Amino acid sequence: MTRLMIALSAMVVVLFLLSLTVGPADVRPTESLAALFDDGYGPLTLVMREIRLPRALLAVIIGGGLGLAGAAMQGYLRNPLAEPGLIGVSSSAALGAVLAINTGLAASLTLGLPLAALAGALAGVFLVMALAGPQGGSLTLILAGIAISAMAAALTSLVLNLSPNPFAANEIVFWMMGSLADRSMLHVWLVLPFALTGAAILLTLGRGLDALTLGEDAAQTMGMNLNRMRLLLVIGTAGIVGGATAVAGAIGFIGLVVPHILRPLVGGQPSRLLWASALGGAIMLQLADIAVRVILPSRDLKLGVVTALVGAPLFLHLIYKTRKGLA
């Protein structure tokens, strides 16, 4: 376990440095890194500080958060098919962003789009908790999340269908594909408190998630407050997923696939999977973001498209291996 964590941490650092040096400009890696710490305000220094550094930081923050949220959600529901968007936060955040684009709020305010997405995420969480009720179990939480997610998706489609501005509709579609391009340090400071707060909350649930592997009755016998655990899970996941969707758009499969890949390596304890999934999620999103810039540098290839193209076949392969092992 210790060796695995060291290896994952080293990969995060290496990919972070690589992300800082990859771009359309033909500049040597040593020059790029030197420009980052330059006291001046030259073109390369501005590119490093205002474009590449925020992008690299967001890949680590968002990828790590989604991986952690996915592991926590799977541990709580005791379902390896669970993922962070199951409680409807990402769909609600997307609806808020779509409304901001369609009404012109995104164009009139610098942070209008991410703030509207965060407002949508908070509204979605409130509705999910209201529907699930204070005493509802995990099944009630899933059903409430599916209902809110379906409603938000339907309203998003309605806004797209009725949008009088074809350019706004086009912007909405491209935003929903997910991207870290054209992000600044403002976006980093916007998502950071939500991601850190959500991560801190989810990491405290490790002992409770371990107890849940024995069943809800056994966990309650061991002194676990399941209602409190569910509330903390929803709040932590909502902070991470809402902030990530607000800044980067819809990025899927990280919270679903990464815990699957790492679970055989860390064992059956959900608490041990939390940290590993956070590092694994950061690695996966950094790799995807680097691939976006390398594969088609002249085209605006969207990050969410790459994560889906890689994550879906990988997930199918994991399902096939699991089914084969049970045969």
Question: What would you call each of these model-derived segments?
Answer:
Residues 1-327:
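Alpha-helical transmembrane segments in inner-membrane proteins
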